[in-house]
Amino acid sequence: MSKNTIVQLILITGLAGLLQAQNAYDAIHKIDNENGFGTRALAMGGAYTGLADDYSALYWNPAGLGYIRNSQFSVELSHLNFQNEANYSGAFSMDNQTYTRLRSLGFVRPVPTARGSCVIALGYNKISDYDENLHFSGYSSVSNGIGFYFTDENEESEFYLFDKNVLRTEQISSAGGLHHWSLAGAIALSPQFMAGVTVALITGKEEYNFHFSQRDINDLFNVYPGDIDEYEINQYLISDIRGLGIKLGGNLQLSRWLRLGGTIKLPTYLTVNETYSSDDLITFDDGSDDGVEDSGRWKYTIKTPYYFDGGVAFTGHFLTLSASARYRDWSQTQFSIPKNQLAEADYRDLIIENSIIRNDYRETIEYRLGGEIKLPFLRTNLRGGYAYFPNPLMESDKTQDKQVYTGGLSLIVDHNINLDVAYLYSDWSRVSKDQFTPAGTLENIFLSKIIIGLSYSF
């Protein structure tokens, strides 16, 4: 037989199918890490629905813009450290990456009115991150189903497994996020009630890199022509995302010290255009190799569910306390399938994925708490907060929920300029698996983020 004529790779799923087939995870992943922006807001745990009264109200509650009395210009940068400790087949690995991003750039302008308030705002804001990484290596005796057909000169073929008792290595990195190019406005409908709306052009990009290899380190696969030394695969996927989002907000001044806020985020259709390429390579014991390459494009649309925010804030002379919650039913996320494409098998598969989302995901309530202490003699405000994000998977346990601990401070540089700093820390665990590592990998993730913001009022 000639091992230079590989005619087919038999995997758990085909290589092209692995890259093209969208699944329930893809739909949820595009929207499940929304953390917003705003140095003050995030330093207070994101408990900002009832309190929002700066440029970041454009995201948290557009009605809060109505409390702004001076024009504002603001800019923010973030620095993320993502550390992933992985346990695969009893072998521990650690991967650590950092990502520095422009977080927001925006402008707020009160419009002169005879009475009440009218304020507009516009700007760019990064509201979610796709930045993460994973690396592990370990010996596994669990079959992943990988095997190959080899043909000889007489076109006779024979199948050879290369599926277990090998050293496996996997490395995954993802970078990018969702961005809002937003226009918002707020008006006073009464002396106690503000209403607002934000319209956001949503753009996003995710660059996904995947590398997997498995080696016969004990020379167990040594019978020609199945004397395979190593199999490796590389995948590269770019996802471009477009959509239009609308958020409605209201804020009620219950008393001089107490405010109540709420928002409704309307469903959004996110169109995803994916470009992928892949290559895989078999290396034999004698050093020869053979492989295949593949590439293509894919387009699909995700419909996101409603979500509802509610919050309350107490503001005193020296102390501010706030709390908020967000309700979302993840099971209402779905792939939107045009009627004229139901005849195509790939799109019919998305109907099955919609059923999986409906059955495997659940409704959640996120909650956030925050506080701020003013120290006028130091021209400084100290902030702290906490946020809790339940895992949307129906069968997940508490260790997979995210808890975020936050803190920060604000320095009055001069009468019109504020420098704000926020620090966010969270850790959680998850079990990940794919076609190549069916036994699964336990990941312990530690995330820390520093956000620096500068605002100018005039």
Where are these regions (language model features)?
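Asp/Glu-centered strand-loop micro-motifs enriched in Gly/Pro and often flanked by an aromatic residue
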Residues: L42-S56, F92-M94
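Transmembrane beta-strand segments of Gram-negative outer membrane beta-barrel proteins
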Residues: N23-Y48, G66-Q83
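Outer-membrane beta-barrel pore proteins
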Residues: A47-A52, W60-S71, P110-T113
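General structural concept
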Residues: V75-E76, Q83-M94, Y99-F107
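Short, glycine/acidic-enriched capping/hinge loops at junctions between secondary-structure elements
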Residues: Y55, E85-S89, F335
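Glycine- and aromatic-enriched membrane insertion/assembly motifs of diderm outer-membrane
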Residues: L65-Y67, Q72, L77-H79, L105, ...
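Bacterial Sec-dependent N-terminal signal peptides
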Residues: M1-Y25
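Outer-membrane beta-barrel porins/channels
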Residues: Q22-L42, R103-F458
